[in-house]
């Protein structure tokens, strides 16, 4: 195989050819030295976030075909004055020191209630120290319970009418959290009708009040102007005391009007008594700013309407009570009830709300735990800056840091190659590199042709055939299921007594060989049985299964189709095999199958007679050769294949292979390169255009919603088989990145799978996944049946695995 090595800055990239997956990192460093002129001790190699260390192989790091390894050049230790040859990684001297979290301001850090019970007159201003007030959040417009912490004179800049908060920012509360907003919101409430005594406010403009919110002590001390303060509301108005036009304080949730929220000033617009217990109250909410009003707002808490207190009212302190109003509960499950156990807002294990000072909050999922409810329990609250619960904590022992040894996976430890004493280098074969992509246009158990793959398509390696979905196994000759049937097979001339007549050939089943350990090939050592893949291929015959004498189909065309791929390895027994690569030859049917003694090795084998049943001409016929020329079918190479290898024959190709060798499962370790490399300039003739059926043309005209897309797609008809690739790209779901299934054509003319759109709506995302056009919560998803029928015609079988 081959890999690429690129410098960390991307300035230089080189391809390392003929590298084995069993190659050690030391061997790789020598190859890099030859290409980049960087000594091994100066190399730092990275792959997928891991630093490659000596003592391991490319297989240990899962380096695959055409993967990129990054190279970082270390300073040469021999040219560094006063340093040893070993360079140790030290912490950067200018790294910022670790800052310890400031202690959270909580009830334990507040002055005692007895110390705050006494009112202190500062000698100026309307309000006294420790007085209970309502403070207006200048960014939100809502009123919150607070108390005066201290009173100071305003500076010259503050006395000119500005009301900045501490640090020049205002606060916005959402679900109990405080978010800072810009200074632009500080004067948004100037146009709201003031409910305070204007004379008192005018006389108190040069005073700054330092307040603390009672329910949000973590916000600290904030600076407030007198116009954003008023005495604490204490009087609940009865229904018969309310009148239209009154300005009162009500509870309202701006985001969810049907739930409890914050407290706002509001003007009553509608009072309606429906029954003795059912009343309707509608108000105009004052949010702040010139346009900060909400009209026709229905209030759900009609029994909690507070009278607005004017400056000069009797001052309240903590000695008179807390006078706290009910806000939106922080937890919807328990309603904020301190006596009710809740596993959502309290300890996840016991649900208790006791001993909050012994609860730890996970910095990842924000879930609380008592230190004694953990497993194992903790003796005290940890002093670390960050703490993570057991479900979020990453096991540091599983993290491989730079310079550390790899932790071998259990899967690799069980592989035969991990325990074998053989020194055979199996890592050079293309059958060992693994797929770089997977065919998803049809499921793996698809019978019949693969959409977009015409007869005569040829690939350089077997792994490419697997990626195209024509024959999924990298090595095995038969792909199928013993309880379903066979989907494809590879004719590679593994048995000398097989007969190939082109449109009809005999095929020998698999098994009967000792492939213990990590073997890929082996001599026959036992009789074959009609099990596993042999049984799967027999099920394709239109006859009852018989594992004794075999069977012959009643109507061979009625059998299940099998995709046949001829390999260049079959050239030794068949003139119909390609000279290079692996060629798709179309659909065959099983005519009959029977057991017999092989003339080459004397063991019992199962034979199958397959006959061609395909509308496309065979690639060895004159019609097939002409069609391949019109479709410009070329030998396909993998991405990144070294260009200097094209057209060259590798070592060992000219060696004569012994006759009678049995190679059913065979790798591509020694497969020859293409003897002829086709290029686009070899033929100046136009590619045969893709032909639409009358039914497809009619349905395309009927699909008016996607007319623009169809116009673009139909312009690629002249590209032949590439038309289907363009069609797949144009109708790909933006969510699952697959061809749309049960497509919903939105009002913005985008196509999305119905299941994908339903998952989006379930996640409360009610917009088009492609353009974010708002579809609305009540959007009706109607599948585009015309488009679904068209896609089934172009890609038969693709919806089977969805």
Swiss-Prot record:
Residues 82-96, 153-177, 188-197 have a biased composition (Polar residues). It catalyses: S-ubiquitinyl-[E2 ubiquitin-conjugating enzyme]-L-cysteine + [acceptor protein]-L-lysine = [E2 ubiquitin-conjugating enzyme]-L-cysteine + N(6)-ubiquitinyl-[acceptor protein]-L-lysine. Residues 448-612 form the YDG domain. It is found in: Nucleus; Chromosome. Gene3D superfamilies: 2.30.30.1150, 2.30.30.140, Phosphatidylinositol 3-kinase Catalytic Subunit, Chain A, domain 1 (3.10.20.90), SRA-YDG (2.30.280.10), Zinc/RING finger domain, C3HC4 (zinc finger) (3.30.40.10). Induction: Up-regulated in proliferating fetal lung fibroblasts and in U-937 myeloid leukemia cells. Down-regulated in these cells by growth arrest and differentiation. In other cell types which cannot leave the cell cycle, such as tumoral HT-1080 and Hep-G2, levels are consistently up-regulated. One of its GO terms (cellular component) is pericentric heterochromatin. Residues 414-644 are annotated as: Methyl-CpG binding and interaction with HDAC1. The modification Phosphoserine is found at residue 667. Keywords: Cell cycle, Chromosome, Disulfide bond, DNA-binding, Metal-binding, Nucleus, Phosphoprotein, Transferase, Ubl conjugation, Ubl conjugation pathway, Zinc, Zinc-finger. A zinc finger (RING-type) spans 733-772. CDD domains: PHD_UHRF2, RING-HC_UHRF2, Tudor_UHRF2_rpt1, Tudor_UHRF2_rpt2, Ubl_UHRF2. Residues 194-288 are annotated as: Interaction with PCNP. May be autoubiquitinated; which may lead to proteasomal degradation. Its main location: nucleus. Residues 117-311 are annotated as: Required for interaction with histone H3. E3 ligase activity is robustly activated by 5-hydroxymethylcytosine. Its EC number is 2.3.2.27. GO terms for molecular function: DNA binding; histone binding; histone H3K9me2/3 reader activity; RNA polymerase II-specific DNA-binding transcription factor binding; SUMO transferase activity; ubiquitin protein ligase activity; ubiquitin-protein transferase activity; zinc ion binding. GO terms for biological process: cell differentiation; negative regulation of gene expression via chromosomal CpG island methylation; protein autoubiquitination; protein sumoylation; protein ubiquitination; regulation of cell cycle; regulation of transcription by RNA polymerase II. Homodimer; disulfide-linked. Binds methylated CpG containing oligonucleotides. Interacts with H3; the interaction has a preference for the 'Lys-9' trimethylated form of H3 (H3K9me3). Interacts with PCNP. Interacts with HDAC1. Interacts directly with CCNE1; the interaction ubiquitinates CCNE1 and appears independent of CCNE1 phosphorylation. Interacts with CCND1; the interaction ubiquitinates CCND1 and appears independent of CCND1 phosphorylation. Interacts with p53/TP53 and RB1. Interacts with UBE2I. Interacts with ZNF618. Interacts with UHRF1. Interacts with FANCD2. Interacts with ATR. The YDG domain recognizes and binds 5-hydroxymethylcytosine (5hmC). E3 ubiquitin ligase that plays important roles in DNA methylation, histone modifications, cell cycle and DNA repair. Acts as a specific reader for 5-hydroxymethylcytosine (5hmC) and thereby recruits various substrates to these sites to ubiquitinate them. This activity also allows the maintenance of 5mC levels at specific genomic loci and regulates neuron-related gene expression. Participates in cell cycle regulation by ubiquitinating cyclins CCND1 and CCNE1 and thereby inducing G1 arrest. Also ubiquitinates PCNP leading to its degradation by the proteasome. PANTHER family: E3 UBIQUITIN-PROTEIN LIGASE UHRF-RELATED, E3 UBIQUITIN-PROTEIN LIGASE UHRF2. This is E3 ubiquitin-protein ligase UHRF2. The lineage of its organism: Eukaryota, Metazoa, Chordata, Craniata, Vertebrata.
């Amino acid at each position: 195989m081959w890999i690429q090595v690129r410098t960390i800055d991307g300035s230089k990239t080189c391809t390392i050819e003929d590298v084995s997956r069993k190659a050690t990192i030391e061997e790789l460093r020598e190859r890099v030295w030859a290409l980049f002129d960087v000594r091994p001790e100066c190399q730092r190699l990275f792959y997928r976030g891991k630093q490659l260390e000596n003592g391991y192989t490319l297989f240990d790091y899962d380096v695959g075909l055409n993967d990129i390894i990054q190279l970082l050049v270390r300073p040469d230790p021999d040219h560094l004055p006063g340093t040893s040859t070993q360079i140790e990684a030290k912490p950067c001297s200018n790294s910022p020191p670790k800052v310890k979290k400031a202690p959270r301001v909580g009830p334990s850090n507040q002055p005692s209630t007895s110390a705050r019970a006494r009112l202190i007159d500062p000698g100026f201003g309307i309000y006294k120290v420790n007085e209970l007030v309502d403070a207006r959040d200048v960014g939100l417009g809502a009123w919150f319970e607070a108390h005066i912490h201290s009173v100071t004179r305003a500076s010259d800049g503050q006395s000119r009418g500005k009301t900045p908060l501490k640090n020049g920012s205002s606060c916005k509360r959402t679900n109990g959290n405080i978010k800072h907003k810009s200074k632009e919101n500080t004067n948004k409430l100037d146009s709201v009708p003031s409910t305070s005594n204007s004379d008192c406010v005018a006389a108190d403009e040069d005073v700054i009040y330092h307040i603390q919110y009672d329910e949000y002590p973590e916000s600290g001390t904030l600076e407030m102007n007198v116009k954003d303060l008023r005495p604490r509301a204490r009087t609940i108005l009865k229904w018969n005391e309310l009148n239209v036009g009154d300005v009162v304080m009500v509870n309202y949730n701006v985001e969810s009007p049907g739930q409890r929220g914050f407290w706002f000033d509001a003007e009553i617009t509608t009072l309606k008594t429906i029954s003795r217990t059912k009343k309707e109250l509608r108000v105009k909410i004052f949010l702040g700013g010139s346009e900060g009003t909400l009209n026709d707002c229905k209030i759900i808490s009609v029994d909690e309407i507070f009278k607005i207190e004017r400056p000069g009212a009797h001052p309240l302190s903590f000695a008179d009570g807390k006078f706290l109003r009910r806000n939106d509960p922080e937890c919807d499950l328990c309603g904020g009830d301190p006596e009710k156990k809740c596993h959502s807002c309290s300890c996840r294990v016991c649900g208790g709300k006791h001993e909050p000072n012994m609860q730890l909050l996970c910095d990842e999922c924000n879930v609380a735990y008592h230190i004694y409810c953990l497993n194992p329990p903790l003796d005290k609250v940890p002093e670390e800056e960050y703490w993570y619960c057991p479900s979020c904590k990453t096991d540091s022992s599983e993290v491989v840091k730079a310079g550390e040894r790899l932790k071998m996976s259990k899967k690799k430890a069980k592989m035969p190659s991990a325990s074998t004493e053989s020194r055979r280098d199996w890592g050079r074969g293309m059958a060992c590199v693994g797929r770089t992509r997977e065919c998803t246009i049809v499921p793996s158990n698809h019978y019949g042709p693969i959409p977009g793959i015409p007869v005569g398509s040829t690939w350089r390696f077997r792994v490419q055939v697997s990626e195209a979905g024509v024959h999924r196994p990298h090595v095995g000759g038969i792909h199928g299921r013993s309880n379903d049937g066979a989907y494809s097979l590879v004719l590679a001339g593994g048995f000398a007594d097989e007969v190939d007549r082109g449109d009809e050939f005999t095929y020998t089943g698999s098994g009967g060989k000792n492939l213990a350990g990590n073997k890929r090939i082996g001599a026959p050592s036992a009789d074959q049985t009609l099990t596993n893949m042999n049984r799967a291929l027999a099920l394709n015959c239109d006859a009852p299964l018989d594992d004794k004498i075999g069977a012959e189909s009643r109507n061979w065309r009625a059998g299940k189709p099998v995709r046949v791929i001829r390999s260049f390895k079959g050239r030794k027994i068949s003139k119909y095999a390609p000279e290079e690569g692996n060629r798709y030859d179309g659909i065959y049917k099983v005519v009959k199958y029977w057991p017999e003694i092989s003339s080459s090795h004397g063991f019992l084998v199962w034979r199958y007679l397959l006959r061609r049943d395909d509308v496309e001409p065979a690639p060895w016929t004159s019609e097939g050769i002409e069609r391949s020329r019109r479709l410009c079918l070329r030998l396909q190479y993998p991405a990144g294949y070294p260009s200097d290898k094209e057209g060259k024959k590798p070592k060992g190709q000219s060696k004569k292979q012994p006759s009678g060798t049995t190679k059913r499962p065979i790798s591509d370790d020694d497969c020859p390169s293409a003897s002829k490399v086709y290029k686009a300039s070899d033929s100046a003739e136009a590619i045969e255009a893709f032909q639409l059926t009358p039914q497809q043309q009619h349905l395309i005209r009927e699909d008016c919603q996607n007319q623009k897309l169809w116009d673009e797609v139909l312009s690629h008809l002249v590209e032949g088989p590439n038309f289907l690739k363009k069609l797949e790209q144009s109708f790909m779901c933006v969510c699952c990145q697959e061809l749309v299934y049960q497509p919903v054509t939105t009002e913005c003319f985008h196509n999305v799978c119905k299941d994908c759109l339903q998952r989006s709506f379930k996640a409360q995302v009610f917009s088009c996944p492609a353009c974010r056009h708002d579809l609305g919560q009540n959007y009706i998803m109607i599948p585009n049946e015309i488009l679904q029928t068209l896609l089934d015609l172009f890609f038969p079988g693709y919806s089977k695995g969805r």
